[in-house]
Amino acid sequence: MSNIKLIVGLANPGAEYAQTRHNAGAWYVHELARVCNVTLVPESKYYGLAARATLHGRDVRLLIPATFMNLSGKSVAALANFFRILPEEILVAHDELDIEPGVAKFKLGGGHGGHNGLKDIIAQMGNDKGFHRLRIGIGHPGDKNKVSGYVLGKAPASEQEKMDAAIDEAVRATEILFKQDMVKAMNRLHSFKAE
């Protein structure tokens, strides 16, 4: 059984960013909300879009911060503090440069790897890195000086299809996480690669 009580999808707000690679975490939460048949609505006290969903009979909060990426922690901390949700009860979905498109992986803890959204969440959670992550592969531009433009750019259709397939699989793995446990969810997700 999962102890996850909050699932966060990282993004930049606004239509101009909606389809950019940096918003992959939000794509996952939107798909999860659709599968759970709930609607994310603006919640000013949590600085984001939020919903309450049920997965296999268990309540879980969904959140997409409406702050810019580097202020994501403000939104996550506001909701987590209000509902007394601990870092280890949080799953944060984010784009991951070090994983190719079409692959997604669960991870517990670790640093921020240069990801500004993760960096701010860690800071706002009192430097506690003990939350779960869903790392959605977006690939790497090959040159660290091109990273900013790359994450804020749109993927070509062939890559987008792979990312969408990995997100669909991540949603199925999340259902396994709530129905069974993280080990089974990881086994399912980590053996998947979109072709």
From Swiss-Prot:
Pfam family, one: Pept_tRNA_hydro
InterPro entries in alphabetical order: Pept_tRNA_hydro (IPR001328), Pept_tRNA_hydro_CS (IPR018171), Pept_tRNA_hydro_sf (IPR036416)
Alphabetized Gene3D superfamilies for the sequence: Peptidyl-tRNA hydrolase
GO CC annotation terms, alphabetical: cytoplasm
Domain of life: Bacteria
Binding site for tRNA: 17, 68, 70, 116
Main localization (coarse): cytoplasm
Record's catalysed reaction(s): an N-acyl-L-alpha-aminoacyl-tRNA + H2O = an N-acyl-L-amino acid + a tRNA + H(+)
Annotated site residues (Discriminates between blocked and unblocked aminoacyl-tRNA) in this chain: 12
The protein's role, per its UniProt record: Hydrolyzes ribosome-free peptidyl-tRNAs (with 1 or more amino acids incorporated), which drop off the ribosome during protein synthesis, or as a result of ribosome stalling. Catalyzes the release of premature peptidyl moieties from peptidyl-tRNA molecules trapped in stalled 50S ribosomal subunits, and thus maintains levels of free tRNAs and 50S ribosomes.
NCBIfam families, per the entry: pth
Name this protein carries in UniProt: Peptidyl-tRNA hydrolase
Species of provenance: Shewanella denitrificans (strain OS217 / ATCC BAA-1090 / DSM 15013)
Name of the gene this protein is made from: pth
